[in-house]
């Protein structure tokens, strides 16, 4: 019997980050639940949904790692995306009804580059009705499936890099490095409109989240092959330490007394600390204990502290 169909599964406290290569045809929550069962984890969460059509990097946070998920939710992300030209759909991908079909103009690399140039930098996006954003507590995609459309506010996002990888008479492939909150389906839909023919996503792969990258990903099928119900900890070797989630923040080593007071919820003074922002907190044994924030009076306040097992 596998972990995915076991009726009464033993659950344990386990901490770490799994860089899952989400397969296509599966929701992010379905992938999360599969991983949670494989690791027999009491607590798990992911850091930003991928569409069912999409594949690629889906960081899964187990146990205490969930306390730091916001830092990955807010991080830059990178994708490769393939779009079909000449067809615009309701959701911006191939899994919804066609809205319009238009002839595709003769495209040159120069014309494509000129179009893409306009989408680099800070741009405004109007989220698709087929998104997880909520209107009066109801996800937009549920309203869209009922044929209901509501007004959505535009949002500013940043496209740091938008590179033409390939194109032919029917399709276009792009590399996108973008800020949090960017809808790739919306981006491709807007690019298609700018080209005068419309476009929609037929393949999407997330390559990077913050400093985590494609080469670090683990496939779900590999985890399922490696799973051993007699050894609950066997898959733990694939987990990354919690501290890797916040490695971009400077580290502060604390004395035993300072660490004690911080863990009691008190702000403390630390010599030679940075003047602002978040910091990684390490105790007198150089063990990661959480995240603190520099206050205006130069003290460090605890923000996310991990529970010692």
From Swiss-Prot:
For this chain, the annotated S-S bridges are none
Could you tell me the Gene Ontology terms of the biological process aspect for this record?
mRNA pseudouridine synthesis; tRNA pseudouridine synthesis
* One of the record's GO molecular function terms: tRNA pseudouridine(55) synthase activity
Q: Show the InterPro entries listed in the entry.
A: PsdUridine_synth_cat_dom_sf, PsdUridine_synth_N, PUA-like_sf, PUA_sf, tRNA_psdUridine_synth_TruB, tRNA_sdUridine_synth_fam1_C, TruB_C
User: Which CDD domains did the record assign?
Assistant: PseudoU_synth_EcTruB, PUA_TruB_bacterial
Q: What is its EC number?
A: 5.4.99.25
What PANTHER family does its record include?
Answer: PSEUDOURIDYLATE SYNTHASE TRUB1, TRNA-PSEUDOURIDINE SYNTHASE
What biological function has been recorded for the protein in this entry? Responsible for synthesis of pseudouridine from uracil-55 in the psi GC loop of transfer RNAs.
Name of this protein: tRNA pseudouridine synthase B
Organism for this UniProt entry = Coxiella burnetii (strain RSA 331 / Henzerling II)
Q: What is the lineage of its organism?
A: Bacteria, Pseudomonadati, Pseudomonadota, Gammaproteobacteria, Legionellales
């Amino acid at each position: 019997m596998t972990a995915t169909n076991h009726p009464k599964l033993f659950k344990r406290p386990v901490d770490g980050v799994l860089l899952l290569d989400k397969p296509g045809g599966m929701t992010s929550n379905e992938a999360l639940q599969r991983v949670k069962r494989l690791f027999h984890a009491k607590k798990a969460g992911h850091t930003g949904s991928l569409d069912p059509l999409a594949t690629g990097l889906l960081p899964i946070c187990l146990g205490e790692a969930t306390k730091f998920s916001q830092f990955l939710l807010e991080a830059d992300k990178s994708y490769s995306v393939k779009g079909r030209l000449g067809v615009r759909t309701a959701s911006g991908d191939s899994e919804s009804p066609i809205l319009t079909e238009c002839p595709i103009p003769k495209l040159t690399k120069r014309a494509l580059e000129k179009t893409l140039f306009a989408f680099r930098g800070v741009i405004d996006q109007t989220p698709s009705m087929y998104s997880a954003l909520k209107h009066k507590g109801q996800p937009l995609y549920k309203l869209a499936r009922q044929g209901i459309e509501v007004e959505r506010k535009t949002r500013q996002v940043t496209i740091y890099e938008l590179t033409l990888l390939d194109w032919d008479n029917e399709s276009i492939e792009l590399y996108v490095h973008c800020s949090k909150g960017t809808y790739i389906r919306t981006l491709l839909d807007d690019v298609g409109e700018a080209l005068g023919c419309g476009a929609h996503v037929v393949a999407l792969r997330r390559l990077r989240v913050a400093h985590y990258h494609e080469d670090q990903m683990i496939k779900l099928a590999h985890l399922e092959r490696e799973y051993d119900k007699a050894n609950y900890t066997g898959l733990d070797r694939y987990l990354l330490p919690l501290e890797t989630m916040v490695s971009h923040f400077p580290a502060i080593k604390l004395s035993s007394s300072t660490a004690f007071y911080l863990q009691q919820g008190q702000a403390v003074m630390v010599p030679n600390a940075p003047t602002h922002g978040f910091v990684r907190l390490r105790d007198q044994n150089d063990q990661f204990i959480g995240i603190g924030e520099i206050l205006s009076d130069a003290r460090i306040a605890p923000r996310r502290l991990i529970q010692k097992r």
